[in-house]
UniProtKB/Swiss-Prot annotation:
Species of provenance: Acinetobacter baumannii (strain SDF)
SMART domains listed in its UniProt record: NDK (SM00562)
Residues annotated as binding ATP: 11, 59, 87, 93, 104, 114
GO molecular function, one term: ATP binding
GO annotation, biological process: CTP biosynthetic process; GTP biosynthetic process; UTP biosynthetic process
Originating gene: ndk
Disulphide-bridged cysteine pairs: none
Protein name: Nucleoside diphosphate kinase
Amino acid sequence: MAIERTLSIVKPDAVSKNHIGEIFARFEKAGLKIVATKMKHLSQADAEGFYAEHKERGFFGDLVAFMTSGPVVVSVLEGENAVLAHREILGATNPKEAAPGTIRADFAVSIDENAAHGSDSVASAEREIAYFFADNEICPRTR
């Protein structure tokens, strides 16, 4: 199995409801290590840049408005098959379709306010991590 890194964002809805610790605990219980994290209030430019691939889609404006509505917690997670493991912990994008016990089933209220973001591939993870973190901000854990 491959050790990978993935980007995780606890979105404004989950931050405002104080779910950060519970969400982090689920990552750690699943064997994912938090190797970088920061709380940040995204600017419009930050959100537009991060979600640029969705610029032509109808939901883009609402997504940017939501992601800039309050602080987020951006993290790099590391572990075996981290991208897939993280996405399984998050559950389906639409919380109504998310399996019980997943983050979105437990903490999200709608497909628009769905508690968290996770990279969808190793290539996306590399791009997304670089968007928020310099190499020297990531602390590999050896113990």
